[in-house]
């Protein structure tokens, strides 16, 4: 952990060039629809990016992953160590990225000596965000995938972010809801980590566990019933070590929820917030919903409240 923290000090956001625009499309999880690739490439090029497809090699595995664990890891590591690449933009999430952690760990020394890259994605990509944040000290973007955003049509209405501007200017969001008194009265600072709750929880008690000290933990999920969410939150309460500075919850309710569903999920989160002796916040504009606001993982975040709502800045 100490080595990771030292390395993180060497790779601040200011270390990234102001005009990073060389994107490698990568996919390390569930199979993607390759008929979408021309539109994905066009969308990114219209935003001013130069796009490479050389690290996409889909031969669907028995589990429905893009390829075998070994091949997915090999392609990912090649992209991570390519000095001509600035950004790894994931085509989609799904499942299977957690399986790649042992391969990344084996190549950690080589990855540390590579030019830092910015990973962009969410959902299953959480496992890879965690590795580059904690082990390499690289910041990354929890945000829309290349196949799930406003430009692709469909349900998601979140536009593709400008990565250079995001790293230069940070983010600021109002209307973050405090879920307990500590959130209302405490000005919180820390390093933002986390992402998809299922992926974060999968590391609990393992050698890939999060170092929570001085962290603000972001959690969101989809396809989880309110009872399953209650169980996941009880697991957090039962952890032997959970010394976070704060917790931020994104969206958990279904993509097209009823008002009672929204209320039920919020009630479960509020109950947890009353049991945890840490500031807890709610911002359901991050996650698998209609909107998925970008945030910078592995980077400092501040939360402060005035009256009914709070403000998140990075």
Locations of the language-model features?
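Charged helix-capping and loop-helix junction motifs
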Residues: 68-72, 106, 231-235, 261-270
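Sec-dependent N-terminal signal peptides
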Residues: 4-13
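ATP/NTP phosphate-donor binding region
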Residues: 17-82
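Internal helical hairpin/lid segments
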Residues: 208-265
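N-terminal small/polar loop signature for handling phosphorylated ligands or for N-terminal nucleophile
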Residues: 57-114
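Conserved anion/nucleotide-ligand pocket segment
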Residues: 137-199
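ATP/nucleoside-binding phosphotransfer catalytic cores, i.e., glycine-rich phosphate-binding loops
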Residues: 251-314
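Short, acidic/small-residue loops that bind anionic groups at enzyme active sites
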Residues: 107-131, 139-145, 279
């Amino acid at each position: 952990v100490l080595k990771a923290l030292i390395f993180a000090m060497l790779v601040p956001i200011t270390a990234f060039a102001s005009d990073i625009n060389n994107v490698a499309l990568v996919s390390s999880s569930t199979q993607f629809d390759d008929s979408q690739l021309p539109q994905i490439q066009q969308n990114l090029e219209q935003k001013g990016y130069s796009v490479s497809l050389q690290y996409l090699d889909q031969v669907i595995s028995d589990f429905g992953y893009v390829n075998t664990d070994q091949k997915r890891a090999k392609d990912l590591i090649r992209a991570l160590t390519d000095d001509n690449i600035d950004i790894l933009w994931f085509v989609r999430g799904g499942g299977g990225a957690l399986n790649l952690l042992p391969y990344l760990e084996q190549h950690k020394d080589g990855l540390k000596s590579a030019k830092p890259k910015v990973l962009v994605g969410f959902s299953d990509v959480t496992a890879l965000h965690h590795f580059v944040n904690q082990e390499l000290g690289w910041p990354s973007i929890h945000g829309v995938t290349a196949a799930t955003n406003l430009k692709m049509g469909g349900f998601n209405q979140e536009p593709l972010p400008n990565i250079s501007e995001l790293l230069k200017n940070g983010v600021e969001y109002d209307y973050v809801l405090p879920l307990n008194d500590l959130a209302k009265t405490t000005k919180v600072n820390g390093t933002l980590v986390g992402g998809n709750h299922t992926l974060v929880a999968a590391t609990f008690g393992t050698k890939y566990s999060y170092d929570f000290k001085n962290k603000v933990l972001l959690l969101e999920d989809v396809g989880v019933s309110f009872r399953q969410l209650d169980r996941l939150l009880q697991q957090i309460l039962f952890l032997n070590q959970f010394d976070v500075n704060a917790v931020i919850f994104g969206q958990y309710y279904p993509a097209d929820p009823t008002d009672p569903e929204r209320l039920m999920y919020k009630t479960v989160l509020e109950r947890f917030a009353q049991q945890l002796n840490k500031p807890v916040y709610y911002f359901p504009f991050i996650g698998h919903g209609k909107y998925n606001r970008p945030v910078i993982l592995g980077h400092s975040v501040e939360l402060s409240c005035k009256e009914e709502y709070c403000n998140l800045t990075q």
